[in-house]
Structures are given as C-alpha cells and as structure tokens.
Design a protein with these regions (language model features):
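Bacterial N-terminal signal peptides that target proteins for export
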Residues: 1-8
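Hydrophobic helical h-region of N-terminal Sec-dependent signal peptides
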Residues: 9-13
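C-terminal motif of bacterial Sec signal peptides marking the signal peptidase cleavage site
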Residues: 15-18
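N-terminal capping segments
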Residues: 20-91, 114, 127
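A broad detector of the eukaryotic-type serine/threonine protein kinase catalytic domain
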Residues: 48-52, 103, 155
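...with weaker cross-activation on analogous glycine-rich loops/strands in unrelated enzymes
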Residues: 77-134, 138-140
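Glycine- and charge-enriched low-complexity intrinsically disordered segments
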Residues: 143-155
Length: 155
C-alpha cells in the first residue's frame, strides 16, 4: 500500500510539473541582447527616459531620436533624424528575415508613424509616447495592429 501511495504521489508531481508553463524571458535576458551588447548598454542608460515630441536628450526623447542615437552608439552608424527619413534610409525585408537591429515601423494614426529597434524574441526597444523608453512585444495587440513594415539599415 505504501508503494502504491508513493507511486501516486510521484505520478501527480510529475504530471503537475510537466504541465506548468515557464514564464516568458525577462526583458533583460542574455538571449535578448545576444547579437549586440552595446544596444543593452544604450538601453540601460536611456530606460525610463520620458517621451517628448522633438526631444533628443534624457530630459525627453522621441522615437526617431532614440533610434538615431541608439544606432550611433551601438553601430557607429548615423541615421536621419525623422521616422520617415529613417524609413527611406532602410530597405524592406520579410518578417522571417528579421534580426536584432532591424527597424520596426508602425502607423499609429493615418498620418503618424512610430519606429523602434527589433531586439529578439518578439521584443523591440523604443520611446513610447505613454511610457517613455521601454521594451515592448511585437505580439502585443496594440503594436501588432499598428505594425507597418520591418526594414534593415545596410551597414
């Protein structure tokens, strides 16, 4: 009888542990930054900086200035200042070809655009109008519904 109870307890434990889900990787996991550590350093220095339209300092920054400064820091590559100019300075790629450093473009309204830098694992860093400099998920319903194009800056 004791062996039967032990078997049942072990079976239940194995069943429960096999069905548990592991949480999504945290934003700062090593895998997120595997291709360019400078992006991680840059993000750490700018995290939580408030959004300010037209801003380009730690007092406040907009999305295109954030991308511009990140590229200069991490890739020593000068990008144009505006979202549409960054769009024009990059080449379209297929979603399946994405890699860290690609630019994600969103149409947030009929005439407004937003840009961020793809990291890995469905995540991108950007200057959010409501939350400042953060990492968001591309599969977030809001961002997924606003997604427009993914593009690559040729180095």
């Amino acid at each position: 009888m004791a062996q039967c109870n032990r078997f049942i307890i072990i079976s239940i434990f194995a069943l429960l542990s096999g069905c548990s889900q592991s949480p999504k990787a945290p934003e700062t996991s090593a895998a997120l930054w595997e291709q360019n550590r400078e992006l991680k350093t840059f993000y750490g220095e700018w995290y939580d900086t408030p959004y300010q339209f037209g801003g380009n300092t730690k007092e406040g920054i907009d999305c295109s200035a954030f991308v511009q400064q990140a590229f200069l820091y991490a890739y020593q590559r000068a990008l144009p200042r505006t979202t549409l100019a960054q769009f024009n300075a990059s080449q379209p790629i297929r979603w399946e070809e994405r890699q860290q450093g690609d630019l994600l473009f969103f149409k947030t309204t009929k005439s407004d655009y937003h840009v961020g830098i793809y990291l890995n694992h469905q995540q991108f860093m950007h200057a959010s109008t409501s939350k400042g400099v953060i990492i968001s998920r591309t599969d977030n319903p809001y961002w997924a519904s606003k997604f427009w194009q993914i593009r690559r800056v040729t180095m």
